[in-house]
Amino acid sequence: MSAIIELKKVTFNYHKDQEKPTLDGVSFHVKQGEWLSIIGHNGSGKSTTIRLIDGLLEPESGSVIVDGDLLTITNVWEIRHKIGMVFQNPDNQFVGATVEDDVAFGLENKGIAHEDIKERVNHALELVGMQNFKEKEPARLSGGQKQRVAIAGAVAMKPKIIILDEATSMLDPKGRLELIKTIKNIRDDYQLTVISITHDLDEVALSDRVLVMKDGQVESTSTPEQLFARGDELLQLGLDIPFTTSVVQMLQEEGYPVDYGYLTEKELENQLCQLISKM
């Protein structure tokens, strides 16, 4: 599958007198239809990277290629039409008096016909389970509902790429998991490419690949399973250790023959059943 996003040796500084560049020769690609999670400590360059992809910042050197086109000042608006952004705080994203108005806002700015806008808004709200709230004021929604509306606003624009900048970080665990599953379903149904900046293990686990950033560089790229198998190193990368990984480590220390690496809860359950049956 071809790459829809590619960064080649991208360097960026916010200030000319910086001791270290914010991004230092960053190179990676994202395949069409892929879900890539980007993790790393604060200041590692995660948010700067996605702002370069969306054309909000311009690299000092290197190139950013989106959907086959080199991102330049002349085509930046064309590129942005292909990208939907959802940020951490949903309250900063609302501009409409009602949910319906808010989702329609971007479409109206593009000059889309009224009937098409109505159809797109209804479809987008249905995808995120918010069709019964379209007459509500955004201020009266819960945090999870607000983020669903923000995602609907992005999806209604029919982008090829959705970027989530810690979009689930302000939600409670239940709301976070529900939102992640909603995004996954939309991604699977419409073959959208998803990039998520996150510290959430559930979000990382649903990714196809994980890119780890450290000090403005790409530290590694791997599958979620390979990442979780790094054990205690995860703490240094800004992630918690998954519950199943902790259990596996504990069993191994006690001498039990459990497979090394990350296991889902179901896989761990199966291994424990096998161990018990041999006792």
UniProtKB/Swiss-Prot annotation:
<dbReference type="GO" id="GO:0042626">
    <property type="term" value="F:ATPase-coupled transmembrane transporter activity"/>
</dbReference>
<dbReference type="InterPro" id="IPR015856">
    <property type="entry name" value="ABC_transpr_CbiO/EcfA_su"/>
</dbReference>
<dbReference type="GO" id="GO:0016887">
    <property type="term" value="F:ATP hydrolysis activity"/>
</dbReference>
<dbReference type="GO" id="GO:0005524">
    <property type="term" value="F:ATP binding"/>
</dbReference>
<dbReference type="InterPro" id="IPR017871">
    <property type="entry name" value="ABC_transporter-like_CS"/>
</dbReference>
<keyword id="KW-1003">Cell membrane</keyword>
<keyword id="KW-0813">Transport</keyword>
<dbReference type="InterPro" id="IPR027417">
    <property type="entry name" value="P-loop_NTPase"/>
</dbReference>
<dbReference type="Pfam" id="PF00005">
    <property type="entry name" value="ABC_tran"/>
</dbReference>
<keyword id="KW-0472">Membrane</keyword>
<dbReference type="InterPro" id="IPR050095">
    <property type="entry name" value="ECF_ABC_transporter_ATP-bd"/>
</dbReference>
<dbReference type="InterPro" id="IPR030947">
    <property type="entry name" value="EcfA_1"/>
</dbReference>
<keyword id="KW-0067">ATP-binding</keyword>
<dbReference type="InterPro" id="IPR003439">
    <property type="entry name" value="ABC_transporter-like_ATP-bd"/>
</dbReference>
<feature type="binding site">
    <location>
        <begin position="40"/>
        <end position="47"/>
    </location>
    <ligand>
        <name>ATP</name>
    </ligand>
</feature>
<dbReference type="GO" id="GO:0043190">
    <property type="term" value="C:ATP-binding cassette (ABC) transporter complex"/>
</dbReference>
<keyword id="KW-1278">Translocase</keyword>
<dbReference type="InterPro" id="IPR003593">
    <property type="entry name" value="AAA+_ATPase"/>
</dbReference>
<keyword id="KW-0547">Nucleotide-binding</keyword>
<comment type="function">
    <text>ATP-binding (A) component of a common energy-coupling factor (ECF) ABC-transporter complex. Unlike classic ABC transporters this ECF transporter provides the energy necessary to transport a number of different substrates.</text>
</comment>
<protein>
    <recommendedName>
        <fullName>Energy-coupling factor transporter ATP-binding protein EcfA1</fullName>
        <ecNumber>7.-.-.-</ecNumber>
    </recommendedName>
</protein>
<comment type="similarity">
    <text>Belongs to the ABC transporter superfamily. Energy-coupling factor EcfA family.</text>
</comment>
<comment type="subunit">
    <text>Forms a stable energy-coupling factor (ECF) transporter complex composed of 2 membrane-embedded substrate-binding proteins (S component), 2 ATP-binding proteins (A component) and 2 transmembrane proteins (T component).</text>
</comment>
<feature type="domain" description="ABC transporter">
    <location>
        <begin position="5"/>
        <end position="240"/>
    </location>
</feature>
